[in-house]
From Swiss-Prot:
Similarity field: Belongs to the RemA family.
NCBIfam families: MtxBflmRegRemA (NF046064), PRK04323.1 (NF003315)
Protein name, entry field: Putative regulatory protein BPUM_1466
Species, as recorded: Bacillus pumilus (strain SAFR-032)
InterPro entries linked to this entry: RemA-like
Pfam families in the cross-refs: RemA-like
Amino acid sequence: MTIKLINIGFGNIISANRMISIVSPESAPIKRMIQDARDRGMLIDATYGRRTRAVVIMDSDHVILSAVQPETVAQRLSVKEEIIDEGQG
């Protein structure tokens, strides 16, 4: 299995293989999830003080805050997969 890395803004990179979901931080359940992760010490804030626009949930139970839109992160992931697929074919 190849390691796929995704840029989530400001030079911060995460492993796409470990990612479970990318969600918007607007809903109350996601806000509770962020607070719970902060209390447990499992929150990674990669926003550099900017507004949180995407919340990335990892399989290690870490919650990562990003300042880029969820659609942008998803697009970067799909472009990365297309490049890998073309290289194998």
